[in-house]
A protein has these predicted regions:
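Non-catalytic alpha-helical scaffolds and adjoining flexible linkers that form interface surfaces
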Residues: 1-26, 30-268
Length: 268
């Protein structure tokens, strides 16, 4: 009986590669059925290697591997086609998605809904005009946070469980969700006066750490509605704060590149 734990013909994408020894690479893979997996592609850096042109990001593949350790061995890769590779700014957005998943996904945890969302997002980035990229990225960020268990609910108040109201302002806290801001709020950080617990603000104390956001935007996020311009404007700092909370101190490299690219393209 075979004991090498062979996995065959799994749909997946390469998120990132780095050199391994003289002629090989380690490929960080996101597969539909097995989640994130690290695979050694032996000889993939040789000019004549059949893997050389396949072990690339944004290429839909059928992957086969074996091994019992965390670092497994790739023994087959087949191009599936059917996906237009992103170009230009869309390509940078694609690398941003890959870096997010490398940083936030644990190895070996399957996320089939996230995989499907990733394929859809790559397709949309390749086909959409640049003015749609913000909407596309915010939707994927939300899906990633929910699928990995990092995002609390958007349409229910933390603590009370009451439905968020569009006309009210909230402070969204990572790991907790939205807290209603005070009706006489002096700024976006003042907490509702009847709140108690570690996030309660009284006297001159600062309110709960979080991001000020309208109830309307929270309801739109819960409904996966990113068509409203105000929702897009408020969703960006909210998603960034949530992602940064879980990333820790190390910033995203691709986010900085996207920022610099935007600045270069702005009229002077």
């Amino acid at each position: 009986m075979s004991t090498d734990h062979r996995i065959n013909n799994q749909a997946g994408f390469i998120l990132h590669t780095y050199p391994f020894k003289e002629t090989s690479v380690v490929a960080e893979v996101f597969s539909r059925e097995h989640g994130r997996v690290a695979l050694i592609a032996r000889g993939a850096r040789r000019p004549a290697s059949a893997l050389r042109g396949l072990v690339q990001p944004f290429t839909p593949l059928l992957l086969s591997w074996f091994g019992k350790s965390e670092l497994k061995t790739l023994h087959g890769a087949e191009w599936q086609g059917g996906l237009i590779a992103p170009q230009g700014r869309a390509l940078m957005c694609g690398f941003y998605l890959n870096e997010l998943m490398l940083r936030l996904l644990a190895r070996g945890d399957a996320h089939q809904a996230l995989y499907d969302a990733y394929v859809l997002t790559l397709t949309q980035l390749a086909e959409a005009s640049p003015d749609m990229f913000e909407q596309i990225l915010r939707r994927f960020e939300k899906t990633l946070l929910i699928e990995t268990g990092y995002a609390a609910t958007f349409d229910k108040e933390a603590g009370s469980g009451e439905t968020v109201r569009a006309e009210w302002t909230y402070v969204y806290q990572p790991e907790r969700g939205p807290w209603r801001a005070a009706e006489d709020q002096r700024g976006p950080w003042r907490a509702k006066e009847d709140q108690r617990g570690p996030w309660h603000a009284n006297g001159n104390a600062r309110g709960p750490e979080g991001v000020s956001v309208s109830g309307k935007t929270l309801l739109h996020l819960a409904a996966d509605n990113f068509d409203d311009l105000t929702t897009l404007a408020e969703a960006k700092p909210l998603m960034r704060a949530l992602i940064n909370h879980y990333l820790g101190a190390k910033p995203l490299y691709t986010r900085q590149l996207l920022r610099e690219l935007t600045e270069l393209n702005e009229p002077t």
